[in-house]
Amino acid sequence: MKNKLLLLFFLLGVFFPLSAQESEVLISTSHTSLLLSTSQGGELKFLYYGRKLTDADVHAIVSTESGSFSAYPVYGLNCPSESALSVQHEDGNMTLQMEVIGVETTHQEKANLTVISLKDKVYPFYVKLCYKAYQDVDVIEAWTEISHKEKKNVKLNQFASAYLPVRKGNVWLSSLYGAWANEARLVQEPLEPGMKVIKNKDGVRNSHTAHAEVMFSLDGQPRENSGRVIGAALCYGGNYKLRIDTDESEYHHFYAGINEDNSVYHLKSGEVFKTPELALTYSDEGLSGGSRNFHRWARTYKLANGDKLRKILLNSWEGVYFKINESGMKQMMADISSMGGELFVMDDGWFGDKYPRKTDRTSLGDWMVDKEKLPSGVGGLIDVAKRQGIKFGIWIEPEMANTQSELYEKHPDWVIKAPERDLVLGRGGTQVVLDLGNPQVQDFVFNVVDELMTNYPEIDYIKWDANMSILNHGSNYLGKDEQSHLYIAYHRGLENVCK
């Protein structure tokens, strides 16, 4: 009977049985369940993730004797294993030993939020494990909130959003990689012993060279419409790292979160460090089933107007590149309208005063209309679009500048630059990245968008571009002890602008 129970729950999903004396935390959607085990003053354990459990299933899992893993592994007292969280306390101690101090579930209209609070057994160091279960789309978001009340800063060396054990078998991994003009190439491979790492160090973008999303096919080579699948997508636009450790145990160990490389974070007393959400889904309808769950989740909860059809558009870039002029824009709008299109987007090349934007070497940062190219301005083009029965969109790249620009001449200190080093330049040999960790830069970027939308409220679409990575590690705004915060501060600033 015991072997039959083990087989049953292996088929259902991923699980770790524990003693029935433990208290269970069951987090469910319409068709999936995540099961954890906890006790006051004990360690939080992971039991299961997969197809939705009945009460009888839960009882069978917790009553079956087997090994288990921490739901959020921490470093220091189990050093050979990978960890989700690694810190250095103010006194130099690099160990953690977390115990459960509380569990709270808040029921919302279409999602339930479960927060499990942990505290170190000795230090006033706290972690909240948060799970938001969207009932109607079968997605669970997982993230952490880290804080402390020690007298001095605590160093966060590693700070994953979540950890998920996946039981070994014939497990295959599907992921996406690529390059410019060669994006989203699918690679599928069996998980073998060792460490598989997918990460991004671009600094600005959640790179097209590798994606922060994977799918685990639990029944062998991936199939589109059949087989058990676990999908994971990290909701973060910056540097990320996905790790899959296949060790000598019975499980593949999956960790996902911000890429901690060169990003040690000095956490102040009372400050809360929130990690990005890891979205998890399960389906027994193959890769397509997992994809459909993610699509429903994104359209319903993450995308503006996610339930609306996207407009058919014409973009000016491939047609004229930087050679924008009023007559050309009018002709392109007439052309897309005559073909039944719904939107025209004027791309790069419409701005610049002292330095008109005629090539990629000048003008980024100077977001005023080039009146020589567009005598009637943006407003005149919007009027033409209305007469043609289409909407109007515009291109910007407000987080960037060129060294040949009025903005750079006024604010060279706004640029991400290593002290005592010459600038490493990007596109056109003059492009630089603005330091979005600086509140003044955040205000500038916000105002670029705000002024466009205030002056031209009928703009229907903004193409926000990003054509450069962070090539120089250094911030004029951050203090000398906070230089390792650069990547995190940049994306916090971007998120602040977009709120």
Locate predicted features.
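Short Pro-Gly-centered flexible turn/kink motifs
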Residues: 31, 87-88, 95-100, 265-284
